């Protein structure tokens, strides 16, 4: 899933963005995956497996999932946000073929614009998403743990490079998974 890729890249980056090399990152990520008891299909299923079913001792997940679980009373477990972490970029797009077919391009484009307004960003922050609007980010800064340095997929070679290196058939992720069996 997308969440699994982000988690993998966060683990890898926690080594290489802290001065380590690829060999050290491979060992670290391999060691982490040796301890994985369940690989759910997405972030919400991961949360449910951990909080509702008690599977696993540690949950690696999106920050907003942990915040949402706490808000819903599913957990009082403390959580750690690494000081060097990956910025998860959730894309949003208007799909030409669909909006043209349904005649709703104008409202769809307006909605996409709205998502980046201070009003929408404040709502996202309420459920654990870090705002991308600088003003709102300052307003809610105290509600989120400090992160010293965020890196992006671009810092790891961009999506095409990341896909080829880590997630293509026979790439690093497959090799790690084969070692778990």
Where are these regions (language model features)?
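Extracellular/periplasmic juxtamembrane helices and adjacent flexible linkers that interface
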Residues: 99-181
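A conserved helix-loop-strand patch within extracytoplasmic ligand-binding domains
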Residues: 1-3, 10-13
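Generic recognition of short, well-ordered alpha-helical interface segments
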Residues: 2-6, 24, 41-42, 87, ...
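Short loop segments at secondary-structure junctions
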Residues: 15-16, 96-99
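Ligand-binding pocket segment of bilobal, Venus flytrap-like solute-binding proteins
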Residues: 13-82
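Small-molecule pocket liners
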Residues: 9, 88-92
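Solvent-exposed loop/turn segments at secondary-structure junctions
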Residues: 1-3, 64-67, 85-87, 98-100
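N-terminal low-complexity, Ser/Thr/acidic repeat segments characteristic of secreted
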Residues: 45-49, 94-96, 129-132
């Amino acid at each position: 899933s997308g969440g699994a890729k982000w988690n993998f890249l966060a683990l890898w980056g926690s080594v290489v963005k802290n001065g380590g090399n690829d060999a050290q990152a491979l060992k670290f990520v391999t060691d982490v995956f040796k301890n994985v008891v369940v690989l759910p299909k997405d972030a919400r299923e991961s949360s449910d497996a951990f909080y509702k079913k008690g599977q696993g001792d540690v949950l690696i997940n999106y920050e907003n999932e942990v915040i949402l679980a706490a808000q819903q009373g599913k957990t009082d477990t403390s959580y750690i946000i690494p000081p060097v972490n990956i910025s998860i970029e959730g894309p949003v797009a208007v799909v030409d073929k669909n909006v043209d077919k349904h005649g709703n391009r104008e409202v769809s484009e307006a909605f996409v614009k709205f998502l980046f307004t201070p009003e929408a960003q404040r709502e996202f922050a309420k459920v654990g998403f870090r705002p991308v609007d600088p003003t709102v980010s300052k307003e809610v800064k105290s509600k989120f743990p400090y992160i010293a340095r965020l890196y992006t997929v671009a810092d790891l070679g961009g999506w095409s490079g990341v896909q080829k290196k880590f997630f293509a058939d026979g790439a690093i992720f497959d090799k790690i998974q084969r070692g778990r069996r």
